[in-house]
From Swiss-Prot:
GO cellular component: cytoplasm
UniProt similarity note: Belongs to the GLTP family.
Protein name from the UniProt record: Glycolipid transfer protein domain-containing protein 2
GO molecular function: lipid transfer activity
Organism the protein comes from: Mus musculus (Mouse)
Lineage top rank: taxon: Eukaryota
Pfam families in the record: GLTP
Length: 321
């Protein structure tokens, strides 16, 4: 019985099923309308600059949707088909999502940025290494490393002398033969300067720019490994001193006498903590950003090292010193 009217059993069963179905239908319709307006789909031909709508312009609702959203049929919706005045004329531009701002320490005025820039520039498209830019990168690397601790000062003191020696060749009377790593190797080989000491009377690789660069090349590898491990070391893992010590054992210790190795290991004990190194590398930023910046810088050093390693190996000069 419905509202005092007796219904047949079949009609009663129909009402019992129809009412829940009608409620479910209305609920689904409500959800679909909400979903339609909350999650707009890409419509390339109707892009606008309304960032609040994710840069997309929605079509005007149909009469049915308009009635459900208090838009009577025939009345303009709140999303007109015509573009807004601010969206027309010469000022109209496609929506561009700004990229994350570069970290200051990687910029032209940051220590890492000043170091990375010449090292990137030294790698020519032809596969060579420009010596003037390579040495400029080394100058900035020395300036960056020296304040980081005793261990870096220990390593950079010798590197400074080698950079100065090569710069004298780049700007000296034979400067035309020292424009790049390839031109230097070619000329010094022709001049008989690439014989290992003791292999041929009257000739010594000790006076060659190629030998000096090889020593810098090994030091660059140690710097790159140390900075990379400081940047990527896990929390609770080995401290920065341990990781830089391992880098020294890999890159430089095999080429140093016993006394130098012991002095280097003592210097590593004074290495600042990882957090302090990150602050010095990228001041004014959080640890996560500093790690990213230092890892990028170490990646550039690795690219330069790999390029130089390939050229030296190709000419059989890795054992020159």
């Amino acid at each position: 019985m419905v509202m005092g009217v007796s219904l047949s059993p079949a009609l009663g069963r129909w009402f019992r099923h129809a009412i829940p179905f009608a409620i479910l239908t209305l609920l689904l319709l409500y959800i679909s309308i909400w979903f339609f307006y909350e999650w707009p789909f890409p419509l390339p031909a109707q892009r606008t600059q309304q960032s609040g709508l994710r840069g997309l312009k929605l079509p005007s609702p149909s009469p049915v949707l308009g009635s459900l959203l208090s838009f009577p049929a025939g009345v303009q919706s709140c999303n007109p088909e015509r573009p807004l005045p601010s969206q027309t004329g010469p000022a109209a531009r496609p929506l561009v999502v700004p990229e994350k701002e570069e970290l200051p320490c990687l910029g032209p005025h940051g220590a890492l940025g000043r170091m990375v820039s010449p090292f990137l520039a030294c790698m020519s498209p032809e596969g060579d290494v420009a010596l003037s830019q390579y040495l400029a990168g080394w100058r900035e690397l020395l300036r960056f490393l020296t304040p980081l601790g005793t261990v870096f000062a220990f390593a950079t003191s010798e590197a400074f002398n080698k950079v100065t020696d090569l710069e004298a060749r780049v700007h000296g009377p034979n400067a035309s033969h020292y424009t790049s790593l390839m031109t230097m190797i070619t000329w010094e080989r022709g001049a008989g300067l690439l014989q290992r000491p003791g292999t041929e009377p009257g000739h010594s690789a000790g006076s060659s720019g190629s030998r000096t660069l090889l020593l810098l090349h090994r030091a660059l590898r140690w710097s790159q490994l140390c900075l990379h491990r400081v940047a990527t070391g896990t929390l609770g893992g080995p401290d920065a001193g341990t990781q830089c010590g391992e880098a020294y054992s890999t890159a430089l210790a095999p080429h140093h006498p016993w006394l130098i190795r012991q002095a280097a290991r003592l210097a590593i004990l004074a290495l600042p903590s990882r957090g302090r190194l990150l602050q010095l590398a990228c001041p004014g930023t959080g640890e996560a950003d500093a790690r990213v910046a230092l890892a990028r810088a170490a990646g550039v050093l690795e690219d330069v090292y790999n390029r130089t390693q390939g050229l030296l190996a190709g000419h059989g000069l890795l054992q020159l010193a």
